[in-house]
C-alpha cells in the first residue's frame, strides 16, 4: 500500500473533462488506501476532493458514500449522515441513493 500511495501522490492532474474523471479516480484511490490504513480522517479529505474534482452523477455519489462510511468508522455519525443526505438531495437517481437511505436509517 505504501508504494501505491507514493505512486498516486506523484500524479499530476489532467485538464479537461476526461481528466476530471481521472483526477477524481486518483483521489478516490488515495482515499481507499487511507481507509485500508485505517486513517479515516485522511480518507474523508481525499473523497471530498474527489467529489469536487468530478461532480457528476456517477462518481460524486460513490465518493460521498465512501466519505460517509469513513466518518462512521470514526464514530462521527452526524458527519456521516450529512454525506448520505447530500447523496439523497443532489443525486437522488444514483445507485448510491438506495444505500444512503439504508445507511441513514442505521444512524437515526
Label the predicted regions.
Residues 12-24, 51-59, 88-99:
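Short solvent-exposed coil/turn linkers within tandem alpha-helical repeat scaffolds
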